[in-house]
């Protein structure tokens, strides 16, 4: 195909028409002349039998469509009759390309049709004439009784298919009929309504020239916008599997104080059925939805006060609009000569004002892109697209993606390109710094980030002086506080709480890491347990270790107080109000300050104090309501089994008579036992991480882990060299070497050197709380399963009964 030819493709019938609907057909000698008052575009016409020839780049107002037309009958207002039996119709139909704001006369040349001078058009007969297969008509025109089909004219475009049979009495008015007896070929064309007056043509600066990379056709319809059909040999959509972007250029009337407004805005993909922009059609007529980008600039006077450029809100401010398909990234050499500037071919697109092209004689040969295809000249209609833009709904903002945004360079009326300011976050470009600052409000997550960060802590600020003052506060910290250092990363902290929180980060990172002791073979998956092991086994200063954080203490009472930090327990409650405290000293301070009234009367059973004797008597009745538990060794009665246990331990045993019912720990005095019981109230059970052992007292749990789950036995007996994990176990063992029975039961012959074993003997044998007794040793148990386990362990040779 030659460079100046367009290949025509069959499409659905569109129309070319006489927009004014007047009498525009007359006889001119041997020719019938049809006048079309509006601009006509012809596009998307491809067929093996129909091609477009003689496209003259120097004269863009002419496009020649050649077709084999056998018979054409045109009548103005009367029926054709008395014509020769057969009339030949010219093969050439001359239709000019789009010309704006002017009346265009098209001639349909019929050199082979013989019409006498004295015969009117109404006398022409059509008995042996052939009709075309397709008729394209529009607006105020009417087609009636063509062949055997009746056709109605709709709104702006009417499609009619004519059967190519001989005509007998058919009438065609105000229309051009193109016939072809070959396979169907549809001329796809549409008109552009021009509402501007002739005086509008004075301003040539409002024209833009859009360069097309490939041979293409432009189709404009009043309701659907401009369509660019690029049909190159290599479709970019097919090669890259991605359609090029679509750029919408909006030109606004500028506020006198806002001369620099302009920029680029991304728009989401358009829906195919609602899109008024540019559609790129491949040869298979498959619609690919491109991305859209809106580039805007300003000219002359208007008022643009909106901060955010919203598609719906700016509809009233649109001055001109043109919708452009994506061009190649190169710039034509002729465009560079017009601009008298060297423009980078990899960065710019060709947007040349048509006024400049006119100044150079409308030489389309000199205005070509890299592929050598001629450029199409378009006029920016002031009224085009206003209704479409107003109907568009506000688009949702797209999240910024990682692709590179293309830059559209717009040459304004003054002949200079716009200067853009890119957003460093999403890549969008703006003409003024003011618009860029307004756009930055769409990135609040970046605005929320503060500039200055403290290297010693997590403090951040936007003010340098605030950071300086904060750093000074670190300098005031004592050296002792700064000595708190993380063992893993070396970071310093001002207090132990911050260090503990920081270590939790390392704990999560090294969850599967095994920690080994440097001094023995002990290893554990938790750093806290390793720290506890080091302090308890290899250090004599802090033998009591917290199982949660690994902190060591000299005394067990300190460990108990510390554990309340992790559990949040407040075992000490005020007896006069709802105040609770984790420390008994704080409770005493509360009572002295809040309840300063003297309470000299005390209950003998629970040691509660009261302000008068009546309150004590009422309180004593509570203890005397039910005493069903009788002691076997005396006449003492208790209201519950716990009181009975305490009675047996305190009265009928000699060592630590006051024993805790939860952990079986004994005390010398009831007051000590009461303080100890308060620790268990409201306290959760602590689970050993290595076995199923559970206990409410964290101190006992720590002792359990040290004694059971450590491999080393640092405490050795000097006599038998037996090893023990704890020092108290060694002390118990040393009593066995003395040969002396320390604890003797008053009710039986049982004796032992182990105080805890003696307590268990008294409770299990000499109380009724253990109803299930062993048949061999009379030891009592709470449940039958415990008794059976005891028999299997200690009386295995006898077996179960």
Swiss-Prot record:
Superkingdom field = Eukaryota
Q: Tell me which GO cellular component terms the UniProt record holds.
A: chromatin; nucleolus; nucleoplasm; nucleus
The segments annotated as C2H2-type zinc fingers are 421-443, 452-474, 484-506, 515-538, 544-566, 572-595, 601-623, 629-652, 658-680, 686-709, 715-737, 743-766, 772-795
Q: Name one GO molecular function term.
A: zinc ion binding
Q: GO biological process: what's one of them? A: positive regulation of transcription by RNA polymerase II
Record SMART domains: ZnF_C2H2
Q: Which residues carry this modification: Phosphoserine?
A: 270
Q: Which UniProt keywords apply?
A: Activator, DNA-binding, Metal-binding, Nucleus, Phosphoprotein, Repeat, Transcription, Transcription regulation, Zinc, Zinc-finger
Q: Which Gene3D superfamilies match?
A: Classic Zinc Finger
Task: Enumerate the Pfam families for this protein.
Answer: zf-C2H2, zf-H2C2_5, Zfx_Zfy_act
As for subcellular location, the record says: Nucleus
* Its job: Probable transcriptional activator. Binds to the consensus sequence 5'-AGGCCY-3'.
Q: Which family does it belong to?
A: Belongs to the krueppel C2H2-type zinc-finger protein family. ZFX/ZFY subfamily.
Domains: entry comment: The binding of ZFY to DNA is mediated by the interaction of the GGCC core base pairs with zinc fingers 12 and 13.
* Protein name, entry field: Zinc finger Y-chromosomal protein
